[in-house]
């Protein structure tokens, strides 16, 4: 079935690329969404059944794929280019949608990959397809962001490749057993600690470009800023999830080795530094898309603190990752409406949003509570669990600065968001303003509702999948 999914996705992408009819394009996008939903249902039913040796829908893969599919529906159906819609050529639109299809396909396959090299291959495919999306508007800013993204991602993925080679050295004479994740976990106690440490450092550093952590976070900021908002919605959620999957699968290997304590220390230091970096930039950022991008760094830092501290933090980290995906993607989609209204991404040029788009403004107000983990946001539950884990571990050296950083971030985020909602914009010409239809915000509300539901009323299946993801980790 995985081969059928991959081949069908490539056919859909190719058809979108060569087709010039708008109606057929819409039908092709709908057809791909039907394929994506069908395959998601298939892997949910066939959990842990390996296909063609290299793909296994385990609990983590299912959680990530379901999250991707839910978010892919509004992002693919969203009106992606408000301001330049009339200027877009049919070929440009086809290239955009074709790249989106390949991007979603690569994410799905990356989640499912059961071999460390196959994960690396599909992560590289996301880089290529994402670059097309970043380049979409073909102006000086998008060209610069595209080359920066390609350059930083290429270096980072070379790091991952070197890490894979070092991991093979750590296996010694057992290399012929293969590099499936299950095999590596089974062999972990006998892996050479020196080579395993080096392998982890390279793989962890390389995948931070996708996860959005220090040190390789920079390319992702520009990518989210310059890409069309639906693409940025995917970059800030499900693409970061793929980076997490790559790191987490390596983390599972080290969890069964003698270097596990050392790995947790590295993760905690990097995660706290990432939250610090996000805090610094959140205080001075003036661009709404960059503000949301730095907010993603903060949340990924919190996720990795949960992983590094262990205990209930494992469960909280997976929950935080999924809930963040829903709220952040919905926020980026709403930024499209903000840009449609104010013709700018600069916060000083926005204001009094309630006057121009009431449904969108109400959403932004609710999303503020959602993204800052203020009840009834489900992120309150995951962050509360992480704080409990830090208290139980007596990790005050992490807890105290983390709480300080989060307080500053809430203040900075609130200052900008309430300015957009209530303060009149500077030098804003109201003539010819394009109104948004309330129904266009419906998908944003549905994504926001999911974080309340999954946080406070999680279905048994959802909890079971998270528990299955972390069951082999030492509690």
Located regions from the model:
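Predominantly late transmembrane helices and immediately cytosolic-facing juxtamembrane segments
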Residues: 214, 328-334, 397-433
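Structural signature of hydrophobic alpha-helical transmembrane segments
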Residues: 1-9, 59-70, 116-129, 196-209, ...
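Juxtamembrane/interfacial segments at transmembrane-helix boundaries in multi-pass membrane proteins
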Residues: 48-52, 159-217, 222, 244-263, ...
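Alpha-helical multi-pass transmembrane bundles of energy-transducing inner-membrane proteins
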Residues: 95-102, 108-195, 209, 281-346
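Membrane-interfacial loop-to-helix junctions in multi-pass inner-membrane proteins
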Residues: 19-33, 59, 87-102, 117, ...
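Transmembrane helix-loop-helix hairpins at membrane boundaries of multipass inner-membrane proteins
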Residues: 1-98, 467-472
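C-terminal ends of transmembrane helices
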Residues: 12-25, 73-87, 131-145, 210-225, ...
């Amino acid at each position: 079935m995985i081969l059928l999914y991959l081949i069908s996705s490539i056919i859909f992408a190719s058809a979108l690329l060569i087709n010039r009819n708008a109606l057929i394009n819409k039908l092709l996008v709908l057809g791909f969404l039907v394929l994506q939903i069908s395959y998601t249902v298939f892997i949910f039913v066939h959990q842990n059944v390996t296909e063609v040796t290299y793909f296994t829908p385990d609990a983590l893969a299912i959680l990530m794929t379901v999250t991707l599919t839910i978010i892919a529906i509004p992002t693919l159906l969203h009106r992606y280019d408000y301001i330049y819609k009339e200027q877009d050529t049919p070929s440009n639109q086809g290239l955009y949608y074709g790249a989106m299809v390949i991007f979603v396909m690569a994410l799905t396959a990356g989640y499912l990959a059961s071999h460390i090299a196959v994960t690396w291959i599909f992560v590289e495919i996301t880089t290529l397809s994402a670059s097309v999306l970043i380049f979409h508007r073909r102006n000086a800013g998008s060209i610069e962001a595209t080359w920066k993204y390609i350059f930083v991602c290429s270096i980072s993925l070379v790091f991952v490749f070197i890490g894979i080679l070092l991991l093979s050295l750590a296996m010694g004479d057992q290399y012929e057993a293969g590099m499936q994740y299950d095999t590596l976990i089974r062999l972990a106690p006998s892996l050479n600690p020196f080579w395993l440490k080096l392998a982890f450092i390279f793989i962890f550093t390389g995948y931070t470009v996708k996860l959005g952590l220090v040190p390789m976070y920079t390319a992702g900021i520009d990518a989210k800023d310059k890409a069309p908002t639906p693409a940025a919605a995917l970059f800030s959620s499900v693409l970061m999830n793929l980076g997490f999957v790559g790191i987490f699968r390596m983390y599972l290997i080290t969890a069964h080795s003698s270097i596990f304590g050392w790995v947790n220390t590295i993760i905690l230091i990097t995660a706290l530094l990432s939250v610090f970096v996000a805090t610094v930039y959140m205080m001075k950022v003036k661009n709404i898309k960059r503000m949301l991008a730095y907010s993603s760094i903060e949340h990924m830092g919190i996720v990795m603190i949960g992983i590094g501290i262990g205990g209930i933090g494992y469960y909280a980290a997976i929950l935080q990752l999924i809930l963040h995906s829903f709220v952040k993607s919905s926020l980026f989609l709403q930024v499209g409406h903000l840009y449609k209204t104010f013709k700018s991404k600069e916060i000083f040029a926005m204001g009094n949003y309630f006057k121009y788009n009431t449904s969108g403004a109400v959403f932004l107000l609710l999303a503020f509570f959602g993204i800052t983990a203020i009840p009834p946001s489900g992120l309150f539950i995951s962050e509360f669990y992480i704080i409990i884990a830090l208290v139980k571990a007596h990790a005050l050296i992490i807890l105290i600065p983390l709480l300080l950083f989060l307080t500053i971030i809430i203040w900075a985020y609130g200052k900008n968001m309430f300015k957009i909602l209530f303060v009149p914009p500077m030098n804003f010409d109201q003539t010819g303003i394009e109104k948004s239809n309330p129904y266009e915000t419906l998908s944003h509300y549905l994504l926001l509702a999911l974080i309340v539901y999954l946080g406070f009323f999680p279905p048994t299946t959802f909890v079971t999948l998270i528990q299955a993801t972390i069951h082999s980790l030492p509690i």
